[in-house]
Amino acid sequence: SETWMQRLEFNPIEVTNYKAGKFVDWMDLVYQNGLRQDYSASVSGKTARTNYYVSLGYTNNDGIVVGDQFRASRSRVNLDTEITKWLNIGLNAQFVHKGSDDIKADTGAAKAASPFGDVYEADGSIKVRPWDDNRVANPLLNRSVDDKYYRTQTFNSSVYGKLTLPFGFTWQTTFNVRYGWRKDYYFDSDIKPGVVAGGKAKRVDYSDYEWSIDNMLKWNRTFAKIHNFDFTFVYTAEKYQNWQSTGNNEGFQPNGALSYHGIQAGITPTVSANDEMQTGNGLLWRLNYSLMDRYLLTGSVRRDGFSAFGQNNPFGVFSTVAAGWRMSEEKFLKDVKWINNLKLRLSWGQTGNRDIGRYAAFSRLTITNVIQNGVNYKGVYPSSLANRDLKWETTTGFNLGVDFGLFNNRLSGSVELYKNKTNDLLMDRAMPEISGYGKIASNLGELANQGAELTLSSVNVNTRNVRWGTTFTYSTNKNEIKHLYGDMIDVLDAEGNVIGQREDDDVQNGWYIGHAIDEIYDYKWIGVWQLGEELEAAKYGKQPGDPRLLDVNNDGKINDDDKLWLGTKTPKHRMTLSSDLNLFKCINFSFVLRGEFGWMDIDNLPRNETNRFYNTSNSVWTEYWTPWNPNSKYARLGANIDSPGVNIYEKRNYVRMQNMALSYTFPKKLINKFMIDNLRFSINVDNAFVISKWRTSDPLTKAITPRIWTFGVDITL
């Protein structure tokens, strides 16, 4: 064992603890069983003209990582009053207070930590370096020495009034307002390695405010009992503002005992402010027409404005046309008893996207320091270029759908086929270095999307005491880059002669015309070089146990000519199966099963490169190649992954039991004796299990996703 410990470069403390049988389970110290508590109480009722609802709620969550906590209290008031027969007014208001002073344990350090260290010093204080060397710090250190304060408050309110006017007209005005406040304070103690002497602190104070107003005029009339017209006109306006002040300081003197409360005690203070504002407005006209409730037509036009776009194009106009045909109402299907509903839908329409920074189209100034004659002056310089022509991104789509209900609606569902084209994508385009600017917000390219969606719902059993229904959904999508920046390059033949031109790809971002926006173009890992292949491996600078890449053209070298299209990073197929079973009108069991298929991502664990292994540090367990274990997937320890760099792509396909729920509702005859109107107990589990070959994390989130059990009691008096 002494030789073994020397090879692993054990420190004296590790040798001592190993010989004494002292072992630290760091994962057990940083992970815990999470607990989520959610309580709510509400009162509702109505009078002859008024409906009201009042509720209070409290949430207390502790996550699976030690120190991960969240607290929130909520209150809500809803009122609706009929002032007269032609006027209704209402109010919906909510206030939420959230707190999270959580300082989480360092799970990354815990994963890498040697089990033969000490958590605490002899006097019971936290030990900064559990192994008395410069490896990772104690995973619990930040929880012991840092300080945090985080609070948010949000107030939302919506006030509305509705007028019923003559001739089928109604008018409704809704005013929405939201206020938000946030305090985010943190102190980093200098007890932690790498923190400046005295420690450092940050205080962020943030508030925001937004309002919107919606005015809607509606008209609905039916003529000759078969012609129905429904007209809607909407005018909207909105405004958003925020204010943020940030103070930082470090090198607290004489020490950091006052934490962020005494931020003025540091020796290098910095302050900054960031205030933002945006506005928008819009107009919408929509007309729905139906003939005998069998032939349906819809047309709409909307004009939206947004302050973040260039001065030349702040507005976008988007139109939609749709038609529907209830075929099941036709005479030739009236006698087909097993068809209850059959509707054909066809639509064409445009939508706009304004997802850009509030000042993306404007030239912005950045504050800088200028030193002249030894004196520090503040100055500003233009850090971005304006684009006066920046405009809305527009998606034009065509949709064909069928809705159906069969066998007394025991089987129902829909089928959707769609084809979309997005133009003028909002993107940052790289600028030439000579310009002095890195990028400029632009409208670029064209992206095509097409796919299908299927929904099937069935009532499998429907008796007096048993009802069982299921719903299955499936969707598939494919996208393709049709056009990028319009930069043309020459196309050469094998002899280097120009035979034409084509639009250039964006290799830096991995965007290639004719391919999906997230399609992977890279080398193909085909395993590991084996014994007996030394001479062949040497041609590529490798040896047995090193990763082996596919030499597509067999020229004895690996370069860009050997890259292949390997797959996409988004699923090609998504499926969901949900089931709901009710027994004797009191027992209910349901589940949701979800799966995503046809996608892949980087999983480089099989590379086993040198920097993953340092003395007794831990890592995710993997197999590795040796002459005695000549597996074809996992490389040797310290494998050569350079020239060129190697990425390994694994499928992220999975099937997940998303949710399972079981509940029992007590019979009213039993509980009414105790003046209880409804009593229900429930148990619920999220993320019950996952089936996947993806090893390193949750295949959907690429992180650790907890399994959550929820026990609930619902009481109505």
Where are the language model's segments positioned?
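Exposed, low-structure sequence patches enriched in small/polar residues
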Residues: 286-290, 300, 344, 473, ...
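Predominantly transmembrane beta-strands of Gram-negative outer membrane beta-barrel pores used
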Residues: 30, 38-60, 64, 76-82, ...
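Intrinsically disordered, low-complexity polar segments
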Residues: 54, 113-114
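Extracellular/periplasmic, surface-exposed regions of secreted and cell-surface proteins
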Residues: 37, 72, 78-87, 92-97, ...
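Glycine-rich, aromatic-lined ligand/substrate-binding cores of catalytic
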Residues: 569-602
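Conserved small-residue
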Residues: 1-19, 246, 442, 459-568, ...
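Extracytoplasmic gating/loop element in the C-terminal half of outer-membrane beta-barrel translocons
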Residues: 13-17, 265, 306, 542-544, ...
